[in-house]
């Protein structure tokens, strides 16, 4: 199993191992082998699961149930490997449902709270992917995940903070979750990440704040009081920030301006959103830019005037012609 684990780090080998029946053998070892065999088998399955077809095959061989059990009850090394495997497997929609059905959310939240360093990051990563589904967002919150993820975003390693910010971003697409994140002190943590974090952390935090403001308008007061306007405004103009990072901060500011008559999204924000209309869709950001612009145009007369001034009408007319 240890040899297969190493071989499975190569793309061609992943295909060959699966073709030779290796998935079934490794799942069997992960379930019934010695402690060392289980560890190596789970490590091999984690590497194999990078391949989409292998990910499906692992689930078909009942590997998800085995991996959830090891993530819950295994040795520290087994838990580490199992968390990584579940993170890779969760990229598949059917696997997401199977992980949840096997009790994976409770196990992953527990690992994110109590695990060792690598376990926490992998568990938070798996939760981030699972949280792309609204039912799963609700289940993660019900399992106590919000408090756990806020703690990781505040006190974790850089990798843990990045994964936690991404998970909070997805969880915040749900109204009740956004309210819960705010109540648990998440706004302050997210603003701190948007100000001082890595590129990935800043982007995840800015999107999380934007989602909260959009779906739970009552959270905007907390963002303003915690200094979020200055932090997000700075991020839209930060020299070292990526275009995407600037864009998500701009979207958050537009949503904020739509909820507070005394706030206005700067022309820089609107220009960032308008520039996205000329680019191909990627990750939904073009759609989100359009939605934010339309919301701004109808939120107040002052916002509508600004929207006209920076060319919003012409840009959306061009977009309408393109999609007609």
Q: Locations of the language-model features?
A:
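Short loop/turn motifs that cap or connect beta-strands within the blades
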Residues: 29-31, 70-73, 111-113, 152-154, ...
